Amino acid sequence: QADFDHSRRHIRPHLDLDQSYTSSEYWVYSKELSYNPAMWTFAHLSYNYTTPGSGSDYIEFLEGFKKAKTIAESEQSHEIYKIVSGSNPDTWVWAYPMEKMEDMSSTASLGGGGEFLQDALGKAEADRINDIYQKVTKSRMRQVIKFRPELSTSIGNDEN
């Protein structure tokens, strides 16, 4: 209930609601599946719409992808969020931090991983991880957003 109250007080007043918008989506941040989180001015968001019931498979893909980035000591960070309510509850969101639009080129080709996974994990494991991604991901949508700190509230500083 506290999440809904917080949303009603602090988030919904800032949303542009049209006639087709009927509910909020709630995202849960996954520290365990994110890699080297960083503050950002802009973010390239990649919404991965997965097949219902494939959550554990997609988590296995995410763990493999993070492992490959760790082995490769990648400089490209990402944050993982799971949409847990609303019209698309089987959606995972990747947030790649950017300072300028040109930074998007470093995140645009990551998809299922390709050569990046193979170099870090070997061909057999990269193929296995990529097969999981191809099997459970129905579609993907991308978006660029700007961070709006004035619309954020700090944890523990919620006013009643």
Q: How does the language model describe each region?
A:
Residues 1-160:
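Short S/T/G/P-rich N-terminal loop/turn motif that feeds into the first structured element of a domain
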